[in-house]
């Protein structure tokens, strides 16, 4: 088993599920109201998307009711968390995690969290795939960043809300900063985890 890959897949799925819980909560607060379009802001009034760095947590939903959307999103978010942490390493576990994340994307679970979950699901399909690469200098270097790259990624996902509350105007003026940091840390986490698995496979074969 690719242990680092399993941890990354589970972590990404956890992030997607947690994002679903958060978005669903704010959608429920908007009550039994109909969205104006398929694209919604999870956070209702007094939040104004044009005045806050997180755009009031944008999402999309195919369900024409905020209350129903929020309830279903929270339920699916909880299921996603449980599946990611307990079952992603099992047969078809990665594919199911990706499917749950697609569901979150379609019913109000946000935009970025479900995409992270889908990536986690795709990684999950490789957990039990035999390793073919042999360690090289590049993979050994990347392996040294495990698990700290993943820790940094997870810390930033939560820290961005604190940073946003303190430097709202700065983040609004530099809107690409947060997605670039998230994407960069996510890619480094995946590569570091793969490097670690390559090294562990070599030790197991020795």
Where are these predicted regions, by residue range?
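Helical transmembrane-bundle signal
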Residues: 13-27, 73-83, 97, 101-104, ...
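Alpha-helical transmembrane segments and their helix-start/interface "positive-inside/aromatic belt" motifs
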Residues: 2-21, 143-147
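Perimembrane loop-to-helix junctions flanking transmembrane segments
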Residues: 35-58
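Juxtamembrane "helix-exit" motif on the non-cytosolic side of transmembrane helices
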Residues: 158-171
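Alpha-helical transmembrane segments of polytopic membrane proteins
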Residues: 66-70, 173-186
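Membrane-interfacial, low-structure loops and terminal tails that flank and connect transmembrane helices
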Residues: 127-145, 206
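Loop-to-transmembrane alpha-helix initiation sites
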Residues: 109-119, 174-180
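Transmembrane alpha-helical segments in integral membrane proteins
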Residues: 8-11, 15, 68-90, 187-204
């Amino acid at each position: 088993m690719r242990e680092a890959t399993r941890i990354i897949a589970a972590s990404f799925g956890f992030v997607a599920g947690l994002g679903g819980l958060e978005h669903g909560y704010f959608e429920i607060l908007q009550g039994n109201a109909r969205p104006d379009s398929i694209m919604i802001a999870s956070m209702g009034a007094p939040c104004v998307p044009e005045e806050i760095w997180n755009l009031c947590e944008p999402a999309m939903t195919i369900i024409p009711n905020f209350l129903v959307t929020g309830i279903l999103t929270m339920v699916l978010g909880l299921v996603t968390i449980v599946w990611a942490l307990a079952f992603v390493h099992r047969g078809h576990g990665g594919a199911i995690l990706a499917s749950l994340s697609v569901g979150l994307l379609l019913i109000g679970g946000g935009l970025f969290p479900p995409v992270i979950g889908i990536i986690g699901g795709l990684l999950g399909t490789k957990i039990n795939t035999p390793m073919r690469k042999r360690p090289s200098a590049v993979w050994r270097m990347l392996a040294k960043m495990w698990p700290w790259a993943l820790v940094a990624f997870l810390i930033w996902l939560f820290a961005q809300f604190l940073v946003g509350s303190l430097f709202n105007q700065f983040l609004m003026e530099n809107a690409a900063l947060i997605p670039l940091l998230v994407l960069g840390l996510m890619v480094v986490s995946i590569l570091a985890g793969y490097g670690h698995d390559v090294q562990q496979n070599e030790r197991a074969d020795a």
